[in-house]
Curated annotation (Swiss-Prot):
PROSITE patterns: ZF_DOF_1, ZF_DOF_2
PANTHER family referenced in this protein's UniProt entry, alphabetically: DOF ZINC FINGER PROTEIN DOF1.4-RELATED, DOF ZINC FINGER PROTEIN DOF4.6
Biased composition (Low complexity): 110-122
The protein's name: Dof zinc finger protein DOF4.6
Lipid metabolism recorded as keyword: no
Zinc fingers, Dof-type class: 53-107
The species this protein was found in: Arabidopsis thaliana (Mouse-ear cress)
Length: 342
């Protein structure tokens, strides 16, 4: 179809005109003032400042409306700025205000608390210093009292408190005095120089541990005695109690107490007692002086027991045979050196 044949009545209109004709614009309406909602129709308007109420306490007009008590319009609550009190209209004046007390200046309260804290801090070091001085004074007085009663207390306090035994200075003087008295009682007839004094001086610088070590070392030698004092150690500066100058040891097969440790000589223990007695009667040069007087403890022996002892000794001599010469020199070296027969 040709365009010339189109109807001429059709007129093309712009799109804007079509839109405006189909969608008309709404006309603005005038705004109306909104009315506040009424609560039951009984709520009154808040009193204005022009209607200030006098304070019933100070009759001041410097008051302020706060709120309605119990949400009742008949009990408005006010606050007086002059006397800083609350009251309710239609009620009684309350001396104790509700809600945080009376309004006071918080700065003054904080400043007073700071002053009190500073005062307490300043007085606290003084009291601590006074207590410490008093404590030191009591300690000094107690220490002086103890040292006055016992002069050796100061020496013990300077030592190590962890030691399980007393320091050497506390036992040294008492032990040396005891040894010195024993030497004076046993050697009254001897006018020569007492070697015990020299040995006691050397014992001052030693301890009991050195004595045990020397006994264990000397127990390995052939001339040592069971639990006896060292024999060959003549050095005054060496360890142990050097009393070999005064108390001489017994024979090689007998102890310091006179007991025989040889099964084949001196007839056992009985022979040890007899040998010790003979050595004591013969002189100090052979067997030395015994530490205990066994002659005072000697019991009377009957004839029957004597014959039994002789038979036992003869039986031992027959049984030993040729081994007697080889084992005649055997002795007990002591518990400290291992506890064995040599």
């Amino acid at each position: 179809m040709d365009t010339a044949q189109w109807p001429q009545e059709i007129v093309v209109k712009p799109l804007e005109e079509i839109v405006t004709n189909t969608c008309p614009k709404p006309q603005p309406q005038p705004l109306q003032p909104q009315q506040p909602p009424s609560v039951g129709g009984e709520r009154k308007a808040r009193p204005e400042k022009d209607q200030a109420v006098n304070c019933p306490r100070c009759n001041s007009t410097n008051t302020k409306f706060c709120y309605y008590n119990n949400y009742s319009l008949t009990q408005p609550r006010y606050f007086c700025k002059g006397c800083r009190r609350y009251w309710t209209e239609g009620g009684s004046l309350r001396n104790i205000p509700v809600g945080g007390g009376s309004r006071k200046n918080k700065r003054s309260h904080s400043s007073s608390s700071d002053i009190s804290n500073n005062h307490s801090d300043s007085t606290q070091p003084a009291t601590k210093k006074h207590l410490s001085d008093h404590h030191h004074h009591l300690m000094s007085m107690s220490q002086q009292g103890l040292t006055g009663q016992n002069p050796k207390f100061l020496e013990t306090t300077q030592q190590d408190l962890n030691l399980g035994f007393s320091p050497h200075g506390m036992i040294r003087t008492n032990f040396t005095d005891l040894i010195h008295n024993i030497g004076n009682n046993t050697n009254k007839s001897n006018n020569n120089n007492n070697p015990l004094i020299v040995s006691s001086c050397s014992a001052m610088a030693t301890s009991s541990l050195d004595l045990i070590r020397n006994n264990s070392n000397n127990g390995n030698s052939s001339n040592s005695s069971f639990m006896g004092f060292p024999v060959h150690n003549q050095d005054p500066a060496s360890g142990g109690f050097s009393m070999q100058d005064h108390y001489k040891p017994c024979n090689t097969n007998t102890t310091l107490l006179g007991f025989s440790l040889d099964h084949h000589h001196n007839n056992g223990f009985h022979g040890g007692f007899q040998g010790g007695e003979e050595g004591g009667e013969g002189g100090d040069d052979v067997n030395g002086r015994h530490l205990f007087p066994f002659e005072d403890l000697k019991l009377p022996v009957s004839s029957s027991s004597a014959t039994i002892n002789v038979d036992i000794n003869e039986h031992q001599k027959r049984g030993s045979g040729s081994d007697a010469a080889a084992t005649s020199g055997g002795y007990w070296t002591g518990m400290l050196s291992g506890g064995s027969w040599c």
